[in-house]
Amino acid sequence: MIKKIFALPVIEQISPVLSRRKLDELDLIVVDHPQVKASFALQGAHLLSWKPAGEEEVLWLSNNTPFKNGVAIRGGVPVCWPWFGPAAQQGLPAHGFARNLPWTLKSHHEDADGVALTFELTQSEETKKFWPHDFTLLAHFRVGKTCEIDLESHGEFETTSALHTYFNVGDIAKVSVSGLGDRFIDKVNDAKENVLTDGIQTFPDRTDRVYLNPQDCSVINDEALNRIIAVGHQHHLNVVGWNPGPALSISMGDMPDDGYKTFVCVETAYASETQKVTKEKPAHLAQSIRVAKR
């Protein structure tokens, strides 16, 4: 899917390294820079791919995901906002509406090290169908040898949220994650609280855990691709570790049956409590990613 994105015809050359393209129904922004290749969907301000020069793709994007208006994209970095997980009210979209609506590219800046982009979403008649509040939501990205994401929300309300990042791995059976802390809510086991005793999370089957006292950096150890991905978290309360395992993967129409084998989600989140936003104090949720050899 990522190769397909970079082979799409250019609709508009925004700058020497930025272009607008289209895949099915969705407008894309493609970054082709000497230090980095990356792509975004305007729907959801959704980072689809990020590949620093000389590295394998860092993010995972499903080959089966549709690129259709209002349909969530499977992979990359979905922005879950203004709620994380199932909605409190029946009939509302899981993980909020921000990932399903078109955003505006507000600014971009390029230099020798990479590209910075800011996307914006504000209240509209469409958002008021889901949520009564006025808001401005900004998604700041800096892509180069590292990837930095900052979700900034303005208004008067409370939210839960996550940067639901899908990381590309060689083989989930040879992946471990450290730096998650010990206490977690096990969503596969009736949301019971449990403890990770050895500090190392592996993924032998379906895994869905909300860690309650994570460290500021989670480390993905990928034996098959012989690399380490360091995931920094800022302004967060939780880190979520997720992989659907074989049975759920088969049931998901937007994922290959064996899709679970080649990704792991390590998510920067504010999920177990609400985050308060005031006019005097905007809220942030931020993630930074870097890659190194094992």
Swiss-Prot record:
Keywords: Isomerase. It catalyses: alpha-D-glucose 6-phosphate = beta-D-glucose 6-phosphate. InterPro entries: Aldose_1/G6P_1-epimerase, G6P_1-epimerase, Gal_mutarotase_sf_dom, GH-type_carb-bd. Coiled coil: none annotated. GO terms for molecular function: carbohydrate binding; glucose-6-phosphate 1-epimerase activity. It comes from the Bacteria. GO terms for cellular component: cytoplasm; cytosol. Substrate binds at residues 74, 99, 208. Its EC number is 5.1.3.15. The active site is at residues 164, 267. One of its GO terms (biological process) is DNA damage response. Monomer in solution. Belongs to the glucose-6-phosphate 1-epimerase family. This is Putative glucose-6-phosphate 1-epimerase. The lineage of its organism: Bacteria, Pseudomonadati, Pseudomonadota, Gammaproteobacteria, Enterobacterales. The gene is yeaD.
